[in-house]
Design a protein with these regions (language model features):
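Aromatic- and Gly/Pro-rich donor/ligand-binding loops
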Residues: 2-154
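A short beta-strand/loop micro-motif in the catalytic core of glycosyltransferases
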Residues: 18, 159-166
Length: 166
């Protein structure tokens, strides 16, 4: 029997070491409690994007500066589209996805909203549940488009559970 693939996603190469500890702990607990090796656990770092990294001499800040001059919806659509293209093949055969730790539910200072939106859109039509484990929560601002997009994604039927550390 082929093992089912559980993908653990997060910001595992972030400077916040607490996020890495939470991800390591979650992976340990999952592997410890898997019965008969039914699942393989694979990690995916959300800080990585093929499209953003394909610009050899441009740094992400420069790309974001260019995007900031576009209309908000064009900029947001571009970012989400980049991540969706990255995720299309990565999560195609995933049986479940776990966001392990991190300040995932953020919209002001990081692209969590874009990562989460792209991931939910990518697996929306597949039987692949998404779980959020020990995530940090930043707040909510109804007037912020990114926050509303994040709220919409978190309320999608693919999201099965959210636990917070706050």
């Amino acid at each position: 029997m082929t093992a089912k693939k559980l993908v653990m996603v997060g910001y595992t190469h972030d400077t916040n070491l607490g996020d890495q500890v939470i991800a390591d702990s979650a992976e340990y607990l999952i592997k410890k409690n898997i019965i008969d090796n039914e699942f393989s656990v694979e990690r995916f770092n959300l800080n990585y994007s093929n499209e953003f990294n394909s610009f050899k001499k441009l740094k992400r800040k420069v790309i974001n500066k260019i995007l900031s001059r576009l209309s908000s919806s064009s900029s947001f659509d571009y970012k989400v589209g980049c991540y969706k293209r990255d995720y299309k093949n990565k999560f195609n055969d995933a049986s479940a996805i776990v966001f392990a730790g991190g300040g995932m539910i953020k919209f002001k200072y990081q692209d969590c909203w874009a990562h989460i939106s792209a991931l939910v859109d990518t697996v929306a039509n597949k039987p692949c549940p998404i779980f959020f484990n020990a995530v940090g929560v930043e707040g909510y601002d109804q007037s912020n488009y990114k926050c509303r997009l994040l709220k919409e994604s978190l309320n999608h039927s693919a999201i099965k559970m959210v636990t917070t550390r706050d």
